């Protein structure tokens, strides 16, 4: 007897007439008047459950099988046969059923076999992966992460693990979570009455990282092509469908590369992972198209087959000002593009992914390379139809004097960035990179409108349950 995942049986990788055991949970049980029960058994290995046909001659049919409800865990042994019913090619003619775990009170089981609102599912995040929606999201999240790793590996990049605890504010925005072991009821103070962080665990102020970029740059200046992929944190009090306090970021860094190199990498990477999603998760994508967003599959296919439009920020502003459409947020040179501006450019004007380059320096971070005009920096955003910004990046400032000037302009203490400045002192090179918010990528591929529903246990303002 062999044990097989449901996906192997449904996809014909287990021979017809062979005996096999599957382990999983009951999605539904249906009883016929002829004394036969049909169990839909799922194990999470694919979207569809496996139908197990159970005759009433099994010794535990009356006492156990007829009491199985949604969520019960079972081990089903039987013979693989061609299915006569619609919806699956194969089913299991059960010869033995072992009940592993019952649902204590089926009437109060939070995941009863009915549709639940997405808001309700967030309240039971420990059980929501049992639903069709969140299970499909979890598999897609895995597929996209694996595709990203595969893409970078195949293209000669090294994965670098950057620290989650840091002293550097990469974005210079100050929206950071503090890490401390000090007694909040008895804080040590300096002579000036300020908190004495010298007595803290790290002997200084420390925070959860907002980006692995600065550390990634250090390794790019030794290994040439690297990427970081891990959790990042923003203490931003935003209750929107696009923001999380804890989320995952993918950040490649390329030495000897300019802004155009970063744009090319972004295009190749996105098309690679979207192809992987279509090839590897067809069943889940079909569900998303039927239940979440009817355009998910066609949107991905169109994205893959589109050439990215390339435009300067200044030209983008001119397009928005002259398009004749009214926006909630005003459009003028120097403003950061809002989501409605981004989506107009990608969905209406170009009807394709857009790379917007060379933004005003005053709305971008200190590390972005100053352009010759003295007003803009070599920054880029990739705008995708259906979501707006999906990637943000730049060519990094490799000139020490220009970096110091930007730090001073933004009121940042250059001594706090001493090691980052060292990279410019010892064999500096032009280098570029970008950041991809992983949850936004998952949301884009699945059509799920809120990023809280594409991460297992969302962390948002006033919510850190589970």
UniProtKB/Swiss-Prot annotation:
- Localization per Swiss-Prot or TrEMBL: Cytoplasm
Q: Which GO terms describe its biological process?
A: asparaginyl-tRNA aminoacylation
Its recorded reaction(s) are:
tRNA(Asn) + L-asparagine + ATP = L-asparaginyl-tRNA(Asn) + AMP + diphosphate + H(+)
Record-linked PROSITE patterns:
AA_TRNA_LIGASE_II
Query: Which keywords does this Swiss-Prot/TrEMBL entry list?
Result: Aminoacyl-tRNA synthetase, ATP-binding, Cytoplasm, Ligase, Nucleotide-binding, Protein biosynthesis
| Top-level EC class | ligase
Subunit arrangement?
Homodimer.
Question: Belongs to which family?
Answer: Belongs to the class-II aminoacyl-tRNA synthetase family.
What protein does this entry describe? Asparagine--tRNA ligase
């Amino acid at each position: 007897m062999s044990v097989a995942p449901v996906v192997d049986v449904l996809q014909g990788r287990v021979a017809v007439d062979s005996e096999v055991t599957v382990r999983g949970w009951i999605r539904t049980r249906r009883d016929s008047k002829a004394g036969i029960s049909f169990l839909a058994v799922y194990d999470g290995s694919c979207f569809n459950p496996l139908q197990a046909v159970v005759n009433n001659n099994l010794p535990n049919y009356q006492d156990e099988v007829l009491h199985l409800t949604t969520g019960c865990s079972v081990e089903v042994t039987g013979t693989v046969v061609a299915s006569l019913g619609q919806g699956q090619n194969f089913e299991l003619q059960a010869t033995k059923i072992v009940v592993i775990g019952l649902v204590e009170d089926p009437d109060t089981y939070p995941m009863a076999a009915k549709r639940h609102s997405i808001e309700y599912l967030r309240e039971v995040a420990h059980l929501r992966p049992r639903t069709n929606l969140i299970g499909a999201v979890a598999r897609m999240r895995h597929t996209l992460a694996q595709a990203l790793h595969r893409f970078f590996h195949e293209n000669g990049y090294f994965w670098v693990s950057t620290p989650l605890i840091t002293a550097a504010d990469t974005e210079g925005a100050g929206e950071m979570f503090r890490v401390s072991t000090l007694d909040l009821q008895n804080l040590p103070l300096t002579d000036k009455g300020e908190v004495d962080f010298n007595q803290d665990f790290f002997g200084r102020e420390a925070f959860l990282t907002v980006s692995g970029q600065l550390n990634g740059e250090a390794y790019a200046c030794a290994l040439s092509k690297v990427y970081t992929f891990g959790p990042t944190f923003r203490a931003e009090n935003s209750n929107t469908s696009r923001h999380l306090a804890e989320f995952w970021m993918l950040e490649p860094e390329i030495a000897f590369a300019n802004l155009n190199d970063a744009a090319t990498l972004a295009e190749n990477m996105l098309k690679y992972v979207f192809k992987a999603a279509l090839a590897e998760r067809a069943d889940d994508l079909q569900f998303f198209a039927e239940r979440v967003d009817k355009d998910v599959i066609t949107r991905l296919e169109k994205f893959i087959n589109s050439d990215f439009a390339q435009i300067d920020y200044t030209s983008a502003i001119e397009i928005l000002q002259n398009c004749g459409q009214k926006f909630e947020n005003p459009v003028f040179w120097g403003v950061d593009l809002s989501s409605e501006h981004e989506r107009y450019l990608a969905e209406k004007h170009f009807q394709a992914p857009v790379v917007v380059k060379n933004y005003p320096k005053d709305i971008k971070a200190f590390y972005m390379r100053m352009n010759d005009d003295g007003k803009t920096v070599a920054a880029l955003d990739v705008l995708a139809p259906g979501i707006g910004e999906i990637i943000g990046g730049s060519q990094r400032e490799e000139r020490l004097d220009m970096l110091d000037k930007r730090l001073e302009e933004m009121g940042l203490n250059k001594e706090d960035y001493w090691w980052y400045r060292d990279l410019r002192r010892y064999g500096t090179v032009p280098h570029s990179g970008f950041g991809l918010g992983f949850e936004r990528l998952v949301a884009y591929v699945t059509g799920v409108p809120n990023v809280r529903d594409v991460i297992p246990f969302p962390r948002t303002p006033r919510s850190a349950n589970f």
